[in-house]
Amino acid sequence: ITMADNYIERQQEQYEARKAAWKQAQKYGKKKLTAVRPAESKSHTSTVSKPEDSKRRVFITGGAEGIGKAIVEAFCLAGNQVAFCDINETSGQETAKATGAMFHKVDVSDKNALENCMQTILAEWNDIDIIVNNVGISKFSSITETSVEDFDKILSINLRPVFITSRLLAIHRKKQPSPNPYGRIINICSTRYLMSEPGSEGYAASKGGIYSLTHALALSLSEWNI
């Protein structure tokens, strides 16, 4: 289990360069891609090819827009089998059409809806190799103007789904007679878990929770190769 910080946004240039290289390779019928490093290291390139047996079954939360959409695109670009969920149906359908990924409209704060989504995917794929817990919202406001309901809403979207998806995958793996030797859960954290600012109590608490939860999950889920 690993955590991804907001550096993903700063890596966008690297991703766009790799995407452009892939499109060029498709245009000229090449089978290998040139992986371009970030701007400060553009002089260093390497050839990357992806073996067929390394394709994975990937589930991403909050994949319709922004960072989530870029994650969906990247996994699809690498030839993986991808499913994602999002509450925004219009953007979700557009991303699914553009990438070929499977889209599920889900409000992740609804425990039953999120669990049903994962159960549907598990029934179709038999297992999930990679989960990316990306979904998240932020609301920065004075603590005197932030209601308890506002605080709870942020945690129900940012933090609780990390536990729900991880727990469900563990339950599924525990039932399998032959354990899957591969498993990864990537949780999107933030520098705000440690470097907060006024009015960010809900967001900071959710990201701090993800940071701590990831450590605990890493110990608990290692039994099932996650």
Predicted regions and their residues:
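Canonical Rossmann dinucleotide-binding motif of NAD(H)/NADP(H)-dependent dehydrogenases/reductases
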Residues: 53-81, 217
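Substrate-binding pocket helix/loop in short-chain dehydrogenase/reductase
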Residues: 142-143, 147-155
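Alpha-helical segment proximal to the catalytic Tyr-Lys
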Residues: 171, 219-223
